[in-house]
Amino acid sequence: MHTNVRRFIKTGIAFLFVGLLIGAWMISRRELGGVWPGPYLVSAHAHAVQLGFVMFLILGVALWLFPKPPEGDARYRPERIDAAYWTLTIATAARIAGELARSAEGPDWLGWFVTAAGVAQVVGFAIYFWTMWPRIRPVGSHLREAKGQRF
């Protein structure tokens, strides 16, 4: 398993635990204190679990399992995957931190911070999928399908 794959998967697991801690905090306050979580806290929890954990695992496993890039492919370069990883990691962590700060009645400029982090997440995904696009191709499956095999 390559370094980039491990990095995506381990970062996803770290985001899972962040999401679980936020979830434990929310349920404790709701059940023991009667305080329902606000939308910013729910958003921080959702981004930690759904984007931070689920998407990072998907991206890491895709990087691991998809066919190698075609010979002479100029688009796929590990540096671009690194750029996507760091953009997504920093943006997702910033988004979660910003949402948590907003849930605590943080300053108004946090709205711009959260928005910028969200846009950076979109940029990170765009870099990843633009780089990976040539790797989404048949390698042998078109031959099996021609013989009548179905998946």
Stretches found by the model and what they are:
Residues 1-151:
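Hydrophobic alpha-helical transmembrane segments of multi-pass integral membrane proteins
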